[in-house]
Amino acid sequence: VAAGNFAAAAAVIAEDSSLPAICGRVCPQETQCEGSCILGVKGEPVAIGKLERFVADWSRENGGVKPEVAPANGHKIAVIGSGPAGLACASDLAKLGYDVTIFEALHRPGGVLEYGIPEFRLPKDKVVAAEIESVKALGVKIETNVIAGRTVTIDSLLDEEGFAAVFVGSGAGLPKFMGIPGENFNGVFSANEFLTRNNLMKAY
């Protein structure tokens, strides 16, 4: 980045990060990569999050990076859930030559990226949709409105649909309540439900 070779920077990031524009915006870099940066011992760590965000945005606006994909190996993998874990898993497997299908219970893929994180932190159409398209460009298929345990089961995916393995990335959808009086009253929402309602109803 310092040398101005943003394409090379994007290629380096793409080797290990499937969702760089998202990670650069919402990951807690201060406790993860930046928290481990040796420069932070005596000064400020490298602003890894901001650099990743910049490079990812530049890459998206300039044609993107085409990761190297191994030849098809003939194995099908099912991924349950299209949140960040499911998308990252599907992306990595597709690069290794697997035929990957994501099964998403809701009507749009993305999980917490789509329904949980507010628009001002993570633009849905500009960033999330573009990152999902980059995963699909690797050959990953996404089926929405498919509820694991009802529409399909793990057994049916393995025994009837011909999948060699199933990755379950269903997310942390159920909140943990505090057990205080009145928490079950009408109009009292968990953080998850509040954020989902906000995103679905476009309250912003």
Task: Please provide the spans of the model-predicted regions.
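N-terminal Rossmann-like NAD(P) cofactor-binding module of classical short-chain dehydrogenase/reductase
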Residues: 167
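Short cysteine clusters
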Residues: 23, 27, 33, 37
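Ferredoxin-type iron-sulfur electron-transfer modules in oxidoreductases and energy-metabolism complexes
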Residues: 1-25, 42-71
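Rossmann-like dinucleotide/flavin-binding elements
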Residues: 79-103, 143-159, 170-177, 193-204
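Residue-level detector of alpha-helix initiation sites
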Residues: 18, 83-85, 108
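N-terminal Rossmann-like dinucleotide/flavin-binding domain of flavoprotein oxidoreductases
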Residues: 10-20, 51, 112-163
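Glycine-rich FAD pyrophosphate-binding loop
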Residues: 98-114
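Glycine-rich dinucleotide-binding loop and its adjacent helix/turn
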Residues: 55-71, 96, 133-147, 175-204
